[in-house]
Amino acid sequence: FIRYGGEAVGLVHLGSRGGEIDWLEELFVLPEFQGRGIGTCAIGLAEKIVSAYSESFYIEAAARNEKAIRLYRKLGYDCLNTVTIRKDFHAERFETLSTERILDMDFQIKRYKE
């Protein structure tokens, strides 16, 4: 858990996929505590821990999560251009935000309907 002023305001979850492949599996900071450098501090601490035994540290972010991507870029992370592909079993629960062309295929960028 991430504590700020003695209060739990978020969490960090690190994971390892073997072979020195280490990931920030999850980072969450309560909305009312965002913008205070808490996430940046948490990532810095995670990097310090992981750098003691690994050569690199990976973070995944949804393409639509611009705020997170800007933070990770500011902290020195580069895009690997990986693609996560999903099959929706309940298409009616999603709405299409945009379409992206990858190679010669069109993919819909979706989110859960509110």
Language-model features: where?
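Acetyl-CoA-dependent GNAT
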Residues: 1-25, 30-31, 43, 79-84, ...
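Short loop/turn motifs at secondary-structure junctions
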Residues: 23, 53-55, 76
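Acidic-residue sensor for enzyme active/binding pockets
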Residues: 25-26, 47, 60
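Conserved acetyl-CoA-binding loop-helix of GNAT-fold acetyltransferases
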Residues: 29, 35-48, 66, 70-74
